[in-house]
Amino acid sequence: PGMQAFIRKFVNLQQNEFLDGSQILLLGELNCADLQQQSQNADVATLRSLCAEIDLRLEPVLLAIFEAGLTPIVIGGGHNNSLPLLSALAKNQQQAVNCINLDPHADFRLLEGRHSGNGFSYAHHAGYLQHYFVLGLHELKNSAATLAQLQQAGAEYCSYQRIFVRQELSYQQALEQCIDVVVQGDGDIGIEVDTDSISLMPVSAFTNCGISVQSAEQFVYQLARLPRSRYLHLAEAAPAQHPSGLSAGLNEAGQVLCALVFAFIQGKQHQAQAI
């Protein structure tokens, strides 16, 4: 649904001095209809097995995209797809990569079978993910076990409460802090956005206590300017979750996804020479 919402809006944007459509390739979507069918009334073990099957289907597609020298913009779909993105990029680079995730949840939960809450912990355990930073983590939406695992992995975060409630630092200072972490070493960088982080966005975990669309655009733009950032992943859009129904959700999700994609494209157009 996120992809359909995006396409409806994106194809109606203008080509002008700010956007060159000839540099954009639309590749389509991964067909998971058979897995979706099998998931009906399935138990937890089966659902986790089906999620792992998505990993196996998606990784070779992404690896081919990276090996072609292209920069994928992946519109989900769940945040489980972070694992095949990171594994494909790491295999393309033949080394562990770094990642910054704008997300109220760290998605660093236990290795208990695959689901959308443990893509990054699986990637770290497999040696695909080195430096990991979570921006906007919500202090009460992550278990003690998750926070302990983050610390053990050497991952870092700057919480939503620290920035917006206690105001210990500005949002721009937090962005600079996360950039300092993910530019360490020489590994490529993945840009992850869980759209659950955005207030009133129709998503799988709807919130009115999140960041603005503008703050998310600012995040994407500044990370896209890094020469080593290699992909953008926009996860968890769910138009049907809009309080006013699917039609309103498609409209709103499409607008937000387009804004974030354009921020990424502009960031790449204005890419810094070397960081």
Where are these regions (language model features)?
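Catalytic cores of soluble, metal-dependent hydrolases
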Residues: P1-I73, N81-S82, K91-Q95, Q149, ...
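Short, glycine/polar-rich helix-capping loops at beta-to-alpha or helix-loop-helix junctions
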Residues: K141-Q151
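Active-site histidine-anchored catalytic micro-motif
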Residues: L56, L62, F66-G136, L140-N142, ...
